[in-house]
């Protein structure tokens, strides 16, 4: 029975989250890059200032709150453990594949943000709004169901499972880790996304700053090895090893490994739009810019710095379980403990954001949207946190990969169908030929 179920899960995952889906996501990014005339190079840097300035809001979120909330969802354990897995499988050259995927992914997430701002509503929030516009209510319901299942699996169980695998060797019992994660989640998410955003706007800068400080210390102490690390990254980018391990290098950046399925910038899933579409006093184009900035910070900045730390360190075992040894060998016990805290914070931030995304999606599916339904959902989310810490089951996580694929297979085609809406302002401003 178990073997039959495992075989079914493998087939389901291969269909919904195989290389063809990752290729679809990457090609969508290429398409939007060409349609936008490489906006992520020519226009987005200048648009970022306008997108971030101003903090006034009337019931919605400020631009900074939206950015930190979307970063909370994407800055999971994959930013540390996932990068280690990428290098383990694809060598130093896999980092370049992550850059390529992120470069095109910036425009995919830009398109998601623009369309969510145009079509997202209170009753059909975020990506659900534009999926409904493209494929009707039935298509939107399938997408929302995938989002709920991904929130319970990848957004909670996979994150806490990966975090516990790091915390347990440091002396933290699995039960204690599970209880703390679940308890903090229930405490922070009782008010829904608005309350969660007030947490993430403080938590994300703190945890990112702490992690960057650790990485800076490693790079300062091992600075003489940086040129060699960069050289290895560029030389290995198109080697057979990097190609085999990093084909559609996105898979290496998005997932820590098959056993943990931890993703990073979430380009193609539409998940970050649940936070960004609520941004007050911003145009759709500015909201799209926030999404593109999220991908840049997540992958181009943080994942690259993580990779450099690993490549300049004396560590040669880049398995996720040994990832923190990079910090312990260079910075001692303090470095390992601090890195462990970062992993726990990254995991919790992702759990907090995804639990709210899942709640929004669930409320779209339910005809009755009462407090009881919210409490039941949060109980299941807390249970998922606890179970993830206790035992990160491979079969469950493979199913979660399939849920991600379910989201992408509806989200990306919806983006392509609505492409004219993404660049409507750009087309309108194009001067007519006389």
Walk through the language-model features, giving the residues of each.
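Helix-loop-helix module between adjacent transmembrane segments
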Residues: 31-33, 71, 101-121, 128, ...
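Alpha-helical membrane segments and immediately flanking helix-loop junctions
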Residues: 57-89, 122-128, 148, 247-296, ...
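Membrane-interface loop-to-helix entry segments
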Residues: 24-35, 39-48, 161-167, 172-222, ...
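N-terminal alpha-helical transmembrane segments of multi-pass membrane transport
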Residues: 1-77, 88-93, 105, 220, ...
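Transmembrane helix-loop junctions in multi-pass membrane proteins
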Residues: 36-40, 78-83, 92, 153-164, ...
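Membrane-interface helix-loop-helix modules in multi-pass membrane proteins
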Residues: 65-124, 132-136, 288-315
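Flexible loop linkers connecting adjacent transmembrane helices
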Residues: 38-61, 85, 91-95, 107-135, ...
